[in-house]
Each structure stands twice: as C-alpha cells, then as structure tokens.
C-alpha cells in the first residue's frame, strides 16, 4: 500500500516537473526560431561540424581515394561528387547542394509556409530518366493535406497498407505494416525479396514512408522489393497481452534496448520470414533501429537462445545514421545534459512512459500545421537539425508519425550517467568494443591489407567467409553530431574484413537527412539497392 502511494506521489511530482520542463523547452524553441528567422539570415544555416573523431585508415593502405561523379537526376541538378576509397570500401560523398537551391529553401522555411511553391532549379529534360516521370518536381504533386494515416496517401499511389499485430515472447503487441499493390486485380505478384524497415528513437516506421513518392519505402517498393515497416513496442498505440505479463502493470514499462533487441526484432523478423517463405531478409534501419541491429548482430551469442540468431536471419543490414557510439552533442547541449542528470530519478521522469505529455499533445493536435511546426522547431532547437535539404512541401507530413510511446527505462539506457548502469552515453565501448573484431572470418577474403588474424575477437565465432555474415551497408552523415559515425568507420576499416561492409560518408547530410533530404533517392536509395547482396538473382 505504501509503495502505491509513493508511486502516485512520484507520478504527480514528475508530471508537474515535466510540464514545466516542456513549457521551458517550448518557449526556448520558439525564441530560437524567431531569432533565426528575423535576425540570423544565413545562406546555409546548418551546423557543419562533424564529431571530434578523425577517420584513421590503416597505415598499410597507401592508395589515395579516386574521385568520380554521377550525373544529375530528377531530384537535383547538382551532379554527385564522389571520392572512392576502394581499399577501405568507403564512398566519400563530397557533393554540396547549390547555394541558390538552399537560399530558396531557406526563404520558405522562414515563412513557415509548408505549401509554398519551391523555386525550382531542376530541368527534367536534362535528367537521365526524365521520361520516366511526368512531374517536374514530384514533391509538388503530393497531397499536402495532413492526415496521420499512411493508408490515406498510399491509396493515391495504388498501394494498400496491410496492418498486422505481432506479439512478442514477453507479451508486447507491436504493429507491422506491409505494402501491397491495389492494382493487380487478384493476379499473383512476382515474388519479391523482403525488406524490413525499422525506425529511430521517438519515431514510428512512418518516417520511412511519409515523403510519399520521394520516400525510401516507396522507392524500394517500386524497385521490386517486398516492403515491410516494423514498429517497436508501445509505439503510437501501446498494447500488451496482460496475461503474459502476469497482470503486473509495472511490467508494461519495464523494458529498454535489451528487450527491443531480444523480443521486438525477433518477432518482426520471424513474422516477415514466415509470411514470405524466405530464409533471410534485408533490414534497413535508422538511428535507434541500427542500434538494435548492431546489438543483435554483435552480441547475439549472448542475447539470443539457440532457436534464433539475428546474424543468420539477415542477408543485408543497411544502417542509416548508425547509432553505435555517442556523439559530442550529448555533452554540448544543456538540455540533454540536464535530462541525463535527472533521468534516473523517479521524482523527475517517473517510472513509466517517458514524458507522456508529448503523446497527449499528439492526440489533441496531430494533423494540424501547428503540431508539425512545433515538432520541427523542437527538433531544431534540441539537435541543431534543420530542413535546408528537405522538400519543404513535405516537411509537415514527415512529423505526422511521431512521437511515440517509449519507456523511461529506455531513456535511462541511452543517457544514464550512473557508473553502475550500462548506458549508451557512458558504456558504448562495452556494448560495441571497437578494438575487437565483430564478424571474424576464417578464410580472409579481405584484400585491403588488414592483418585481421591478429585482432581480438568479440562474441561471434569465426565463419568460413564473408558470405556467411550479413552484408553491412552504412550511410554515415558527416554533420551528425548526435552519434559518432567516424568512430564506427574507424572500427570497420581497421578491424573488419573489407568484404563484410560498404560505407558511404556524406559530407552535407545530418541525422534526419538520410530519410527526408530532397535527393535521398539518388544519394541513398539507388546506391543501397545497387549494393544489396542476394544469393539468387531476382
């Protein structure tokens, strides 16, 4: 009885503190937006710093990266400026979007008008596949009505979204969505390779699809893949099997990254494989989703029982803005430091849902321009991300599918400073030891010059060749200071076989640009599908 009283008092106190906290954040976000719009005019307002880590290739690799380019496309008249380092398997994307394009985009941002016409530089007659698309700008042809339901938009493209509920082994019911053509009139579709998309922190899988015909989800479907969109536990609508939880309501929020890797990822993958009849699938993940993927691959020997090993279920693992090591922003931002100091106290954040006020506001306001605008300015204030590279007419749509329910315990896993807790911020090197080999192969088919035989191994036993591990494809934004992508690059180029991975390092992208940039199809979508590995030709 006493514990229940204390719990209710903590909930009340934390509600008061968090309401004040969010009010202060809201005011600061509005003020920053006002100052930026009216007093700080910049052609390129982005934070162009990278993390503090420098990329350090193995000393034995002497060749300088070779420069090459790809032509302009339907989404941009700026040819891609690429620098290829074959020894380290890295493509350096040095492309800089023209100032004229960014200036016209910035003016739209300042006006806050998500429906304004963008001043176009694109000449579709110059694009190599201009005849394939009748629109000079696909984004301008999109429906700008704000509806928090992907099915509304995708019906316009001739795609149905099937919704499934998948139950995890520990009793959580998670949502899984599936693209299915509405135009085949009952004719069986050609068998497609399954691809599962997994979202980042405080997002749903709608983030992969909210840009409509300019989204990665749509592009993958149109490219011939069987697209599944996975959500983690609780998500937009929290659901549980209380019988499996022993009717213990405290267990509803007693979970963190470990349970998401052990149960959510396993349940989603098994459901897709059982539904499609394939033995393996490709996993495309963003941010937190990449943390789940890498944890399951690197530490699967410890996390999974013998009936499931993630490393044996994936043909490809595509990591967008991978969150493996913490970036400098976690220490630089006062708001994040303050949150980290209080995250372990139930008097500040409670013990259940993380800042439930966010979901209350979403329930009341989602589908309005003001909700999407406030979501954007808060992201902008907290992380210095902006919409310079996004299609402005789609910006409001992109915020329709966040935030989502997460647990306080999950945020403790991300931010806790306590020495007795293993957190991403303080213990990433223990979860992902960067001086050990994660994917060891007995037959070294690495031609990069690395002497991997002398490296210490982590948990995965040696396999005969790189084909027995998933093919790992990473797109790392240089301007992403939330995570340390450069440290992850250093790990792979110095401690993993060249044949296991492929990296793109994109100079002008930030954390969310890998999903929503106007040219994301050219800079991520196309190279992704060109490098996916399949045992049998499709």
From Swiss-Prot:
GO molecular function list: sterol ester esterase activity
Bilayer topology annotation: Single-pass type II membrane protein
Biased composition (Basic residues): 60-70
Superkingdom of the organism of origin: Eukaryota
Residues with Phosphoserine modification: 73, 107
Family per similarity comment: Belongs to the AB hydrolase superfamily.
Protein's name according to its UniProt entry: Sterol esterase 2
Source organism: Saccharomyces cerevisiae (strain ATCC 204508 / S288c)
Gene expressing this chain: YEH2
């Amino acid at each position: 009885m006493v514990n229940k009283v204390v719990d209710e008092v903590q909930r009340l106190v934390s509600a008061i503190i968090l309401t004040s906290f969010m009010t202060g954040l809201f005011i600061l976000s509005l003020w920053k937006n006002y100052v930026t719009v009216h007093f700080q005019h910049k052609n390129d307002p982005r934070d162009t710093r990278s993390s503090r880590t420098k990329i350090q290739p193995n000393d034995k690799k002497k060749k300088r990266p070779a420069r090459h380019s790809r032509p302009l496309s339907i989404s941009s008249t700026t040819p891609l400026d690429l620098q290829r380092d074959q020894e380290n398997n890295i493509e350096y994307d040095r492309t800089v979007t023209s100032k004229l394009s960014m200036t016209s985009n910035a003016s739209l941002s300042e006006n806050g008008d998500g429906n304004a016409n963008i001043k176009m530089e694109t000449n579709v007659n110059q694009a190599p596949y201009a005849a394939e698309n009748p629109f000079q700008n696909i984004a301008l042809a999109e429906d700008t009505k704000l509806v928090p339901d992907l099915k509304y938009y995708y019906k316009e493209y001739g795609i149905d979204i099937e919704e499934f509920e998948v139950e995890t082994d520990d009793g959580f019911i998670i949502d899984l969505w599936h693209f299915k053509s509405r135009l085949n009139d009952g004719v069986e579709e050609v068998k497609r390779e399954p691809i599962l998309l997994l979202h980042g922190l405080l997002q749903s899988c709608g983030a992969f699809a909210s840009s409509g015909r300019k989204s990665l989800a749509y592009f993958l479907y149109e490219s011939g893949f069987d697209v599944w969109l996975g959500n983690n536990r609780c998500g937009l609508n929290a659901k549980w099997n209380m019988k499996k939880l022993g009717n213990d309501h405290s267990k509803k929020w007693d979970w963190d990254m470990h349970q998401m890797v052990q149960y959510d990822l396993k349940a989603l993958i098994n459901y897709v494989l059982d539904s499609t009849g394939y033995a393996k699938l490709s996993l495309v993940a963003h941010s937190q989703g990449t943390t789940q993927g890498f944890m399951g691959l690197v530490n699967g020997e410890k996390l999974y029982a013998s009936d499931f090993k993630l490393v044996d279920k994936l043909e490809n693992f595509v990591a967008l803005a991978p969150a493996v090591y913490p970036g400098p922003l976690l220490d630089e931002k006062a708001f994040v430091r303050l949150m980290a100091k209080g995250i372990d106290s139930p008097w500040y954040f409670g013990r259940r849902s993380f800042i439930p006020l966010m979901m209350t506001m979403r329930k009341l306001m989602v589908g309005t321009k003001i909700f999407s605008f406030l979501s954007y300015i808060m992201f902008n204030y907290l992380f210095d991300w902006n919409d310079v590279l996004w299609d402005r007419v789609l910006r409001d749509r992109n915020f329709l599918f966040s935030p989502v329910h997460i647990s306080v315990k999950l945020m403790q896993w991300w931010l806790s400073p306590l020495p007795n807790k293993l957190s991403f911020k303080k213990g990433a090197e223990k979860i992902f030891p960067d001086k050990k080999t994660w994917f060891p192969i007995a037959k070294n088919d690495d031609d990069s010059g690395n002497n991997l035989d002398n490296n210490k191994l982590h948990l995965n036993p040696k396999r005969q060749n790189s084909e027995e591990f998933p093919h790992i494809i990473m797109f790392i934004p240089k301007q992403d200071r939330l995570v340390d992508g450069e440290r992850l690059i250093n790990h792979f180029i110095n401690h993993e076989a060249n044949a296991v991975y492929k990296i793109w390092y994109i100079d002008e992208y930030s954390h969310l640009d890998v999903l929503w940039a106007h040219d994301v199809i050219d800079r991520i979508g196309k190279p992704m599908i060109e490098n996916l590995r399949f045992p049998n030709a499709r």
